[in-house]
Amino acid sequence: MTHQPSPVIHHHFAPAKINLGLSVLGVRENGYHDLHSLMVPLTVGDELEIRPAGALTLRVEGADLPTDERNLVYRAARAYLDAAGAAGGADLVLHKRLPLASGLGGGSSDAASTLLALAELYPAPDHRPVDLPALALTLGADVPFFLLGGAALAEGVGERLTPVDDLPPVHLVLANAGAEVSAGDAYRWLDETGDFSGKLRLEAMRLALARGVEVPYFNSLQAGVLARVPSVLTTLEALADAGLHSVLMSGSGATCFGLAHDAAQAQAAAAALAQRCPGWWVTAAQVRLPLSDNSGGRT
């Protein structure tokens, strides 16, 4: 009796992101917001396992999430397979490492990694090309960013991306006290005040990052979240007390970050903060630049 070899399992890394500054310039008539944000991928994130199969299945480990059309990974896989006219499917296993609804783009990154993985597994035929960025945008405004594999200036509603490749090394600590904030709520709270902002000062930010001094960035969503989610202020204060600088909320929250001067300081601050705040999600990380390829972190 002969045994068929098991399908090869492909591993893809789905990096978290932070916003090194997020300016909301205004709101459109359709309810979408115009943004100006420096988005950067990090060395921490979720992991995706994928292997070819006859049908599409999804299993999630590390979080209680749906495994059908309600899950963005499943929708991304279904969208790509349909667009490419692929005859097969895939067994997907998502290992969640990032906290949910945390401002780190975890779901969007997972979806982008799914698209990249399936494009490698089931390349679209020449007569039926798949526009991955366009497909990604149908899944969410942040998803196209994660196809780039590097830092980018995001404009429009987040769909206009300009790669940024001249950032210095950036070391940081991420912390989340356990709160979840939906992006919809964060933007609604901003709309209630109408406190929109001007564009980020990118050159000043680059210079400050290179010098390791306080970075002149801001997050337009932060004030509204602070007024309603007290643990975010506690998190920002804890990061500053740990000796980190330029503390800021990432995206719509509730994860916050502070910058360190080097990897050693980041690791020490993360260890001290985790000990002082048991139950928090805390980790050291660095900006994932540059990437050697655009594979989404395949290993």
From Swiss-Prot:
Keywords: ATP-binding, Isoprene biosynthesis, Kinase, Nucleotide-binding, Transferase. It is an enzyme of class 2 (transferase). The keyword Transferase applies. The active site is at 17, 142. Transmembrane segments: none annotated. Pathway: Isoprenoid biosynthesis; isopentenyl diphosphate biosynthesis via DXP pathway; isopentenyl diphosphate from 1-deoxy-D-xylulose 5-phosphate: step 3/6. Its EC number is 2.7.1.148. One of its GO terms (molecular function) is 4-(cytidine 5'-diphospho)-2-C-methyl-D-erythritol kinase activity. One of its GO terms (biological process) is terpenoid biosynthetic process. Pfam families: GHMP_kinases_C, GHMP_kinases_N. ATP binds at residues 99-109. It catalyses: 4-CDP-2-C-methyl-D-erythritol + ATP = 4-CDP-2-C-methyl-D-erythritol 2-phosphate + ADP + H(+). Catalyzes the phosphorylation of the position 2 hydroxy group of 4-diphosphocytidyl-2C-methyl-D-erythritol. Belongs to the GHMP kinase family. IspE subfamily. This is 4-diphosphocytidyl-2-C-methyl-D-erythritol kinase. It comes from Deinococcus radiodurans (strain ATCC 13939 / DSM 20539 / JCM 16871 / CCUG 27074 / LMG 4051 / NBRC 15346 / NCIMB 9279 / VKM B-1422 / R1).
